[in-house]
Structures are given as structure tokens and as C-alpha cells.
């Protein structure tokens, strides 16, 4: 004890004396705004420092959210709202919090269904404040009043919280329910808790929770260009609305001259339009079919043009020969067409310009009393008409001609005969034959006849000049020879045109058959030649390999002269298949089905498919079509 007392006596006592007038020194870092001004003017209480610090943090998080395009405070004037916080005029803050543009009432303006829940929560909190005394408090009778600054700052933070876009929030505030039923989310409960805060510490807690729940990586302030991986130059950076990744307007391709307005998507997030494109196999088949149809149409048009040209040439040659045999043409010559029989029992005809030289032919003229000097035996000389009229005959009911006996067929042969009619000048050989000697089934009985018809003769029908039979009266002299020459020339021309048309029809049928074979489901073994690498011994067994692609190529190049060559190649393809493959294999079965299909289609198209695959003896040569 003596030692302790000795130590205390030697210890300087003045170190324990504290002067009462020494002003306290504040050791804190000054902040911006109101806190900085207050620190310069004098000492500030701890509660005021918390208030000023909270105002600065609220302004800072609001500015980062706004500059980073993560959201905005839903107030009429943002600058007025910020100035109210900076100047500590908290009464100017709006009483309404808006969420995504829609006004959301606070406190007493809540919906009816939430009033009871809200009121019960407030009553419970007030009851806890009134009934539960603090451990350090000495007054247990009066509750502590809530500061107005706490209420205003809580409302400001709630407005910021409601202004943040929901897609930029993460847990715990971003776990909204995805069910169809509207439920109270964590964010709503957090807002209720914030508005019921009674101290600055509670507001600080809600502020830190909000700061941790925001996706700051999506902010444009922290955005990196997806192309160049660089920050900065925010004025030239645009965010994709799909992935929220930044892109400089000069880094995207094609370059942008300015930041586009509205929604913008990067090339990866751009909505892709589905193109209704067919698979390559179907597209190739459709294209080839269209080309084949076009080629067929061109061939048919060219064939029709050639046939018309040949018919016109044959008609021109016939007219030239006839004009050479006749006298020089005169002006005013009229073409006369005589209907041989009418249903009314009368036949009309046109007479020449001088009817006084003609003579009407009636059944009385058919009696054996010839008047002219002609040498016909059983013919009745017709009155000579003007050379301008080739055929003339008239039967009228005025002369007492009955319907059955009034039919007179007048056939004029171009050629000068020896017989002369009773008229002026030198007449031409004309032959009249009574209708009594004409059979009812004869093709000449009910058909108008004219040698000057300009109508083209169909390819499958013989011209009218060929319908003259030897049973009719034959012309005499040179006219007979010339007429027979004309008939033979016309027969040869028609035979050539019909043969050519038949050959072209066969080749078009072959082309159609190839297309049908390629489209068939069982054509897969025959589409292309067998590869020697896959089947090495195939070419040792098969000496003449062939496939549908080769046949189709030969058809397109018009290498087949007749349909029999095409049919031989098709049968060679099947014989190769049956020779190499076993009869129970899939290839052989497909070949059998395809062969039966080919035979059926060929018969429907009019092609002759013989079992021995031999070509016909005579097939008219086919003319190659011009492409």
C-alpha cells in the first residue's frame, strides 16, 4: 500500500484535469450540400448529420439510376424534387408514389382491401412503441414522436424504389410472383415497411437493401461495347432492348449515324423472319419440273408453227398449180360455193354475171337427149357459163323440182376437156351427175363442196380434193393427169406432216414418262449410276450401266430418234437391276414396282411397250425441236 501511495504522489495530477471551456473538435469528413454548409457554420448534432448524410445518399442513388437508364422518379419535375432534398425543404415532396407511370396512393389513399391490413400493421407498431419501453429510457409513459424528416426521407426513398424498372431488380426485391393471381410481392412489403419507418437507421437499412437489389451491371455507366469491349463515350453508345448490352454506333455493322429512337435490337437479338424455303431436294425437283414444262410448251408451240407453215406452203403450191392450168384471172371473179342439199329440198347457187348464157338443170335434162357436141357417153352437158364462175347450179321450186329429185352434184375439174357445151366460147370440161346415182351413205351427198376453200386442212383429215373416187365421172384429157398429180402431192405432204407429228408426240410422251419415273417413290435405286468405290464388282457383271439421270439427259438433248430407243434404255436399266441384285432384295422389288408403273403409264400415253423390247419396223423420224 505504501508503494501505491508513493506512485500516486509522484504521478502528475494535471493530466486528469479537463478544461470546461474547450470546444469539442469534430472529426468527420464534410459532404456536399447541407451537411457541408452546416459543418462550416458550427457544430452539428448527430441526428442532423444522419439526416444530411441520408439526403446525400438518396440523391446519389437517384442520379446513378437516372444516368444509367435504369429508371426514373415518377414525379412531374425531377429537378424540383432534387432541389427540395438538397435545400432540406422536404415539405415540397409529392405525396404520391408512381410505379411505371401509374399513380400509386400512399397511406390513406390505398385501396379498400388493403386499408385494414395497413391500419392493423400501424396499430401494431404504435402499440409496440407505446407498450414496450426502451432499456435505457427513463420515461415509460409518453411515446417517442416520429420525426417529420424521417417520414419525408422515407417517402423520397420509396419514390426512388418505385421508379426503378422491374427488369433491373434482383433478389430480394426482384422476386415477383409469375402466377396469374395478383399477390403482394416482396417489393410491396418492403415499401410498406419503409413508409412505416420511425428512425434514420431503418431508412439506411432499406437504402442498402435497394442498392444491393439493383443490377448495376446493366447500367449504361458501366456498359462496355460488345464489339470493342471498351467503356466510355456514352453519348455514342446504344443499348439493345433485348440483351441490354452496349454497342457504339460506329462499331455496329452497318454503322449508325445517330442514336436511334424507340426500340433497337442488336444483330443477335433482332427478331428473325422465318423464310418459308423448301428443302433443297424439293426445291430442285420443283425447279426442274418447271423447266421441263417450259421446254414442253416451247416444243409444242414450235411444232404447231411448223405444221401451220407446212400447210400454208402446200396450199400455196396447190393454188399455184391450179392457177397455171386455168386461164388468166380477171377482175371481179367471184368464188362460188354450192350446198348440195338443203333440208327444205332446194339448193341455191350463184350464177355468173351473164345469166342469159346459162341454162337451168332440172330432172328433165337427165333424160338421154344430149344437146351439145361433147363426147360424153352417160353425161348430160351442162350449159356453159362465164369463165369467171367455176361452179354454177340452181334448183328452184318454181320449176317443179321435188326435194328428192332436185339434188344435183356439179363437179368441175380444172383442166380443158374436149367436150364443148352449148354456149359461147370454148368451154371447160364439166361433169354433171344426177343425185339418183349417188348412194345415201356417200360422203358427197350432204356436204358443201368448193375447190377454193381457204380453210386449212386438219392433219388427221384428208383434203376434200382426195374425196373424188374413180366411181365418179372421170375428167378427160390433160385434166385427169393434173388432178391425179395434185392429189398425190397432197397425200405425200399430209403423210409427212402426220408422221412428224406422231414422232414429236412420242418424244414428248417419253419426256413426261421420265419425269414421272423420277418422281416415283421406288426410283431411288435408279437415280444415279452405281459408284465403283461402293460396289467394286458391279461393272464386272454389268457391261452397259445406265440410270435415270442419263436417260433424262438424253431426252433433254433430243438424242433419241424414236420412242423405241427410249424404251430400250429403260428396259436395259431394269435388266441390269435384275441381273445384279437378288430377286428378294429391296432394289429388285423396287424395280418390279417401277417397271409395272412404267408399262401402265406408257400404255396410257399411247406408246407400244413390247415384251421383247424391239423397236417397230418403221418409225417416222422425229424432227429436233429448236430451243
UniProtKB/Swiss-Prot annotation:
Gene3D superfamilies: Bromodomain-like, Zinc/RING finger domain, C3HC4 (zinc finger). Residues 281-327 form a coiled coil. Residues 270-503 are annotated as: Disordered. Phosphorylated in mitosis. Its main location: nucleus. A zinc finger (PHD-type) spans 222-272. Residues 386-395, 402-412, 486-496 have a biased composition (Polar residues). Residues 348-359 have a biased composition (Low complexity). One of its GO terms (biological process) is chromatin remodeling. Residues 287-326 have a biased composition (Acidic residues). Residues 502-605 form the Bromo domain. InterPro entries: Acf1_Bromo, BAZ1A, Bromodomain, Bromodomain-like_sf, Bromodomain_CS, Zinc_finger_PHD-type_CS, Znf_FYVE_PHD, Znf_PHD. Keywords: Bromodomain, Coiled coil, Metal-binding, Nucleus, Phosphoprotein, Transcription, Transcription regulation, Zinc, Zinc-finger. GO terms for molecular function: DNA binding; zinc ion binding. Residues 272-283, 417-431 have a biased composition (Basic residues). Belongs to the WAL family. PANTHER family: BROMODOMAIN ADJACENT TO ZINC FINGER DOMAIN PROTEIN 1A (PTHR46510:SF1). Regulatory subunit of a chromatin remodeling complex, which forms ordered nucleosome arrays on chromatin and slides edge- and center-positioned histone octamers away from their original location on the DNA template to facilitate access to DNA during DNA-templated processes such as DNA replication, transcription, and repair. Involved in regulating the spacing of nucleosomes along the chromatin and have the ability to slide mononucleosomes to the center of a DNA template in an ATP-dependent manner. May play a role in transcriptional regulation. This is Bromodomain adjacent to zinc finger domain protein 1A. The lineage of its organism: Eukaryota, Metazoa, Chordata, Craniata, Vertebrata.
Amino acid at each position: 500500500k505504501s508503494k501505491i501511495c508513493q506512485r500516486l504522489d509522484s504521478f502528475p495530477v494535471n493530466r486528469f484535469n479537463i478544461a470546461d471551456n474547450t470546444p469539442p473538435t469534430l472529426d468527420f469528413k464534410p459532404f456536399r450540400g447541407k451537411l457541408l454548409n452546416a459543418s462550416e457554420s458550427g457544430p452539428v448534432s448527430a441526428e442532423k448529420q444522419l439526416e444530411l448524410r441520408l439526403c446525400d445518399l438518396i440523391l446519389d442513388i437517384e442520379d446513378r439510376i437516372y444516368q444509367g437508364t435504369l429508371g426514373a422518379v415518377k414525379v412531374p419535375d425531377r429537378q424540383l424534387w432534387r432541389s427540395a432534398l438538397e435545400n432540406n425543404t422536404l415539405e415540397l415532396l409529392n405525396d404520391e408514389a408512381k410505379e411505371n407511370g401509374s399513380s400509386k396512393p400512399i397511406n390513406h389513399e390505398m385501396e379498400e382491401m388493403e386499408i385494414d391490413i395497413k391500419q392493423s400493421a400501424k396499430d401494431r407498431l404504435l402499440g409496440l412503441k407505446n407498450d414496450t419501453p426502451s432499456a435505457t429510457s427513463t420515461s415509460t409513459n409518453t411515446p417517442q414522436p416520429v420525426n417529420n424528416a424521417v417520414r419525408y426521407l422515407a417517402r423520397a426513398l420509396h419514390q426512388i424504389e418505385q421508379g426503378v424498372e422491374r427488369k433491373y431488380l434482383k433478389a430480394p426485391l426482384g422476386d415477383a410472383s409469375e402466377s396469374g393471381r395478383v399477390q403482394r410481392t416482396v417489393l410491396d412489403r418492403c415499401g410498406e415497411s419503409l413508409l412505416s419507418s420511425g428512425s434514420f437507421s431503418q431508412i439506411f437499412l432499406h437504402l442498402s437493401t435497394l442498392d444491393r437489389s439493383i443490377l448495376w451491371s446493366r447500367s449504361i455507366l458501366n456498359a462496355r461495347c460488345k464489339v470493342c469491349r471498351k467503356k466510355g463515350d456514352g453519348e455514342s453508345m446504344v443499348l439493345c432492348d433485348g440483351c441490354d448490352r452496349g454497342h457504339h454506333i460506329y462499331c455496329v455493322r452497318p454503322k449508325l449515324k445517330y442514336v436511334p429512337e424507340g426500340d433497337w435490337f442488336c444483330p443477335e437479338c433482332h427478331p428473325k423472319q422465318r423464310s418459308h424455303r423448301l428443302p433443297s431436294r424439293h426445291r430442285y425437283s420443283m425447279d426442274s419440273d418447271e423447266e421441263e414444262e417450259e421446254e414442253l410448251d416451247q416444243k409444242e408451240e414450235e411444232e404447231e408453227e411448223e405444221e401451220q407453215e407446212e400447210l400454208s406452203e402446200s396450199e400455196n403450191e396447190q393454188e399455184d398449180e391450179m392457177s397455171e392450168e386455168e386461164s388468166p384471172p380477171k377482175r371481179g371473179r367471184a368464188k362460188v360455193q354450192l350446198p348440195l342439199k338443203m333440208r327444205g329440198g332446194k339448193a341455191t347457187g350463184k350464177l355468173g354475171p351473164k345469166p342469159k348464157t346459162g341454162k337451168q338443170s332440172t330432172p328433165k335434162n337427165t333424160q338421154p337427149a344430149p344437146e351439145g357436141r361433147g363426147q360424153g357417153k352417160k353425161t348430160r352437158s351442162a350449159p356453159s357459163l362465164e369463165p369467171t364462175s367455176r361452179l354454177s347450179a340452181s334448183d328452184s321450186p318454181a320449176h317443179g323440182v321435188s326435194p328428192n329429185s332436185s339434188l344435183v352434184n356439179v363437179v368441175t375439174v380444172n383442166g380443158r376437156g374436149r367436150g364443148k357445151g352449148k354456149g359461147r366460147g370454148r368451154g371447160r370440161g364439166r361433169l354433171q351427175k344426177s343425185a339418183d346415182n349417188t348412194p345415201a351413205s356417200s360422203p358427197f351427198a350432204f356436204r358443201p363442196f368448193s375447190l377454193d376453200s381457204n380453210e386449212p386442212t386438219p392433219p388427221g383429215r384428208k383434203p376434200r380434193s382426195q374425196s373424188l373416187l374413180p366411181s365418179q365421172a372421170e375428167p378427160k384429157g390433160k385434166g385427169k393427169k393434173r388432178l391425179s398429180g395434185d392429189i398425190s402431192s397432197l397425200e405425200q405432204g399430209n403423210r409427212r406432216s402426220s408422221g412428224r407429228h406422231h414422232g414429236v408426240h412420242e418424244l414428248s410422251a417419253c419426256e413426261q414418262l421420265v419425269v414421272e419415273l423420277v418422281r416415283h417413290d421406288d426410283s431411288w435405286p435408279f437415280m444415279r449410276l452405281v459408284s465403283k468405290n461402293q460396289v467394286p464388282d458391279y461393272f464386272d457383271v454389268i457391261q452397259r450401266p445406265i440410270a435415270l439421270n442419263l436417260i433424262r439427259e438424253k431426252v433433254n438433248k433430243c438424242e433419241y430418234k424414236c420412242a423405241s430407243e427410249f424404251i430400250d434404255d429403260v428396259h436395259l436399266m431394269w435388266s441390269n437391276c435384275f441381273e445384279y441384285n437378288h430377286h428378294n432384295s429391296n432394289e429388285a422389288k423396287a424395280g418390279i414396282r417401277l417397271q409395272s408403273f412404267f408399262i401402265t403409264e406408257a400404255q396410257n400415253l399411247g406408246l407400244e411397250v413390247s415384251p421383247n423390247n424391239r423397236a417397230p419396223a418403221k418409225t417416222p423420224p422425229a424432227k429436233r425441236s429448236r430451243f
